[in-house]
Design a protein with these regions (language model features):
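Peripheral, non-transmembrane regulatory/ligand-interaction domains of membrane transport proteins
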Residues: 1-94
Length: 94
């Protein structure tokens, strides 16, 4: 799923999908992407989106890197902390 966020006079406005307007979206959330969504994002921004498997395999020393003209930061975050079974997930910022 892709959600694009555009700047508005009152803040950020979410839009479903990849918005291809000028100015470009200020923020784009990528969650559980299909392969076609992944390819669309990679093409639109000329970046490579790491898979969940790739994010999990990154050593701590490799979680901040540059590839092409993009900077990548991958972090591990806890979630479901209020439950009996908290867990963690990896999240990348590009």
């Amino acid at each position: 799923m892709i959600t694009s966020y555009q700047r508005t006079p009152t803040g950020l406005a979410p839009s479903p999908g990849l918005v291809k307007t000028k100015p470009a979206p200020l923020w784009v959330d990528l969650s559980y992407l299909t392969r076609s969504e992944e390819l669309a994002v990679e093409s639109a921004f000329r970046i490579e989106v790491p898979t969940r498997e790739e994010m999990a395999d990154f050593e701590v020393s490799n979680r901040l890197y540059a590839y092409g003209e993009a900077l990548y930061l991958t972090i591990t975050l806890p979630y479901q902390l209020e439950t009996d079974f908290p867990t963690i997930t990896d999240l990348s910022f590009i």
